[in-house]
Amino acid sequence: EVDLGLDEYVNGATGPVFVLGTRERAAAFLAASRHRRRIAGVVARGLPAGESVAQVARVVWPAVEDWMGRRQEEAILELEDAVGARRLAAGIDEVWSLAQDGRGDLLVVEESYALAARADGDRLERVVDPRAPGVVDDVVDEVIESVMTRGGRVAIVADGSLEERDRIALKLRY
């Protein structure tokens, strides 16, 4: 029954799924679920019925952090593989242009990276005042949106993880 309820979420969302329940119930769910590949983590702990969302979040959060750490590592490794295949763009100027063309498979960006700029087609002009007319206050956010709307994936990594790539990198589809 729970697996049926999960169908709607899994078919419409791309986010992770975490299973929370006693060891026995979590194991039974995993054995019966059609969605095992979407399960990002299991928290083997029971909670009283009617527990608050805040309490559930506190219990599940360590598993979410573990999953995010694994995703960051996987994204960095995927970028390294793309270097060998000559399918990697780095730095906001190159990434901006290729993302607009729909070539992004995986965008990896440092979590606090933001940049105000004026967009002129494929080119970006950095600005001092993010409130000036015609300025995009955060072109990094625009790149993220562009990659996602064109079916690409996005991974946010810790600051300093992409220093050699100017804080942003794009694995190309072709």
Segments predicted by a language model, with ranges:
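Terminal alpha-helical anchor/extension segments at protein ends
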Residues: E1-Y174
